[in-house]
Amino acid sequence: MIRRTTRRRFLRTAAWTGVGACVWPVPRLAAAGLSANEKLNVGVVGVGGRGASNMNAVARTENIVALCDVDARRLAQAAEKYPRARQYADYRRMLQQNDIDAVVVNTPDHTHAVISLAAMLLGKHVYCEKPLASSVYEARLMADVAARTGVVTQMGNQVHASDHLRRVAELLKAGVLGRVEKVVAVCHKVLRHSGGDLPTDTPPVPEQLDWDQWLGPVPERPYHPAYHPGGWRVFWGFGSGNFADMGCHILDAPYWGLNLGYPVRIEAEGPPPNPDVAPKSKLVRYHFEREEGGSPLEVVWYDGELAPAGEVIEGVSDGVMVIGERGRLIYNFRGGATQLLPTETFAGIELPEPTLTRPQNHYVEWTEACKGRGETSSDFHYGGALSEVVLAGVVAYRVGEPLDWNGREMRAANCPEAEPLIRPPARSGWFPEL
């Protein structure tokens, strides 16, 4: 177990009403300066699907001491691989296991916030899958609590640690394109059940599933196999469709490399919004103010079946084209060589030396930072801001009108109808009282 030391003075003790009206103690954090062979004790929430991949990756260097899943079948499968880990159906009970240093959160988007907040308030380091949350407000809250507790955090956009993405960010930071005029992002993925309707039949809840725990903070609705396992991403309230699923990956390089911050206006197009289900395709257009002034920088996102009419995107497949005064940079998220076009323009230009660190991988960057060795680069401050931008684009699509966006205040002054989507209602007893 990692040696602990009292962290700097934190916010007042948080009360929790979810498990027998217990009160969470003042957090204590893992100490820095650990020996090279000392390992973190890690608890994992959500151990199937993507969660299994994350768990196995962290287990290469650390101890898995606790497993939690609302699906008993998935929990049993994980326990076969990690028989020494204690098993839980309720993450709140898992977090009371005193030897846990860090937590990996792999659950559906709508429970990212409540689990991560509970862990951070106990001083546990957190790795949480992307997008950071299911709403703008939750992503901001997670970033704020991470900053106030001082825990080490990382959002799970794993390609952020790759040499491929970091080289693109370096080129953009160095200004190789000159003044950037536009960013075009494309994702051809279409999620199962997108563009459909909300299920109306009410089959029985499987015996192995704790449906109330699966719902967590969202308003109650009947179980349906379209939601679990795996289909939840396209149903509003649980997930936010294609864009939220892939936006934190594909927009990561230009967001980081161009230091974009918050947009000032967001527009969206696509099929008429369904109040319950995400569409198969959409277009989202952002306008970002520039520090040096002048016309805003435009970032356009296309996903699913929507053809990017009128755009020059040859060579882009699930990636971005950054258009600048000197030419274009083409980056494909899934790999392949980054291109600077036209080739004759850039042939004689000396490209900048690498300036960003190259971690072993995204997980090791986090675990090393938990031990006081280095920092994470997609922490909840960065990952939260990127998630907010993506999720605000989803809001613009759902309300069906442009948003004059105030990112700092998380509101659209011209569209009060957006407020319930920015900060959705939650069932009582799930969010901690801060």
Locations of regions flagged by a protein language model:
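Conserved SAM-binding strand-loop segment of SAM-dependent methyltransferases
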Residues: R86-D90
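Residues forming the Rossmann-fold NAD(P)(H) cofactor-binding site
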Residues: A52, A113, C248
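N-terminal Rossmann-like dinucleotide-binding module
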Residues: A14-Y82, V159-S162, P254
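Contiguous beta-strand/loop segments that form the cofactor/metal-binding neighborhood of enzyme cores
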Residues: R167, R179, V184-H188, H193-S240, ...
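N-terminal glycine-rich "phosphate-gripper" loop used for MgATP/nucleotide binding
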Residues: T107-H110
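Beta-strand-loop-alpha-helix segment that lines the small-molecule cofactor/substrate pocket
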Residues: A113-A161, G175, G400
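N-terminal Rossmann-like NAD(P) cofactor-binding module of classical short-chain dehydrogenase/reductase
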Residues: V103-V104
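N-terminal secretory signal peptides and thylakoid transit peptides that target proteins
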Residues: M1-G18
